[in-house]
Regions:
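Catalytic cores of secreted/periplasmic lytic hydrolases that degrade extracellular macromolecules
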Residues: 15-127
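Generic cytosolic/nucleocytoplasmic N-terminal low-complexity/intrinsically disordered segments
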Residues: 1-2, 91
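Basic side chains
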Residues: 2-3, 119
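Sec-dependent N-terminal signal peptides
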Residues: 3-15
Length: 127
């Protein structure tokens, strides 16, 4: 019953029109580097915030995986997942100089899909 209620609570929050603006605003508020690319990542990872079988039921916009527990990270709300992304992913960007953020994502192996960056750029160009 708990999972159903969580899913129902997410539906009104993640309506396509307002969500991208809200997520982008929060990315900037939390000082996430390359916020528009990261916004595109959240869209790609959640299927425009409409996935049925992904990490969205855990308020996880980025599909961040807990390798110790073999499950998606759970966040109390979607804004916390942005903080999780910043701490879990972007701290590595600051440790080394990269040509660009797409290169960084490829180098750290962010996604297993070999076409991830191409898909990400297509979404980015639609924003």
């Amino acid at each position: 019953m708990k999972k159903i209620l969580i899913g129902l609570c997410l539906i009104p929050l993640f309506s396509i029109g307002q969500t991208t603006d809200e997520v982008l605003k929060e990315l900037k508020k939390q000082d996430v580097k390359f916020p528009k690319i990261v916004l595109a990542q959240s869209i790609l990872e959640t299927g425009w915030y409409d996935c049925k079988d992904c990490s969205l039921d855990k308020n996880n916009l980025f599909g961040l995986w807990n390798s110790k527990k073999h499950e998606y990270f759970y966040y109390t709300n979607w804004k916390e997942s942005i903080g999780g992304y910043k701490r879990g992913i972007q701290y590595r960007y600051l440790k080394k100089e990269y040509k660009d953020y797409y290169h960084f994502l490829s180098e750290i192996g962010y996604a297993t899909d070999p076409h991830y960056i191409i898909k990400l750029k297509k979404i980015f160009n639609k924003l």
